Amino acid sequence: RPGKETVFGPAHLVVEDVPLPLAVPYGFFPFNKNYSSGFIMPSYVDETVRGFYLRDGGYYWAINDYMDLKALGEIYTKGSWGTSVETNYNKRYKYRGNVYFSFLRTVEGEKNMPDYQVTKSFKLQWTHSKDSRANPNTTFSARVNFASESYERKNLESMYNPLSYTQSTRASSVSFSHTFPTIGLSIAASANLTQNMRDSTIAMTLPDVSFSLARFYPFRRKYSVGKERWYEKISVSYTGQLSNSITTKEDKLFKSNLVKDWRNGFQHRVPIDATFQLFKYINISPNLSF
């Protein structure tokens, strides 16, 4: 039946155009239009520092047609463990994105010995994009790639992947903008973060907001009657920016003081212009900005 299942009669197996003496009397393949949830079997391996472990086992949940969720875990015989959660979402003609979070608790050495060490590390990744057809006057996007300084050194995949150590910096950004067409006002806001993985230095700007108001004529009459007055030619526009930034170490970021450690400020510009005609032949264009 079209769209339901496929049924076939007697068949034999062929590998690289070579028929094999393996046959089946019939076959039945149903079509399933829905995503399926289920358990993910872990892998069992031995690692020198952390011992035997079960890794990448968990559960996949097909929440609906727009979102899924995958939760994985890993556990080691010498006390280390980790977990990760990843979700994908996609709303057609509106937005799409992916979120990934991983946490590791790594135990190295023997307890009560000088080399004993417990390290907690994490990684957060988020990508999001908005379809312009959903709302042409609004944009929102995110590209976040943040990890604690010790994550790549403790993550098992990175330990055996030399390319991961070549990435010395990580960059993250989240941006939003909205335009009010009826009044000519535009607002844009963003948060940016650059992370140096070698010395755990973080440069963050949170937030960075800009405003702009299109040129308008405040003294122009709503209903113009007769000749245009001289003051009706005066135009005004506006731009402004608010910024708040800091450069610090990873372990000091949440202990920083907004007044002492952060650099913040606000600047704006208000241009006032006009164009007048003198004696029908000379144009005068005075302007003032503050």
Predicted features, each with a name:
Residues 1-290:
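Outer-membrane beta-barrel proteins and related beta-barrel translocases across Gram-negative bacteria
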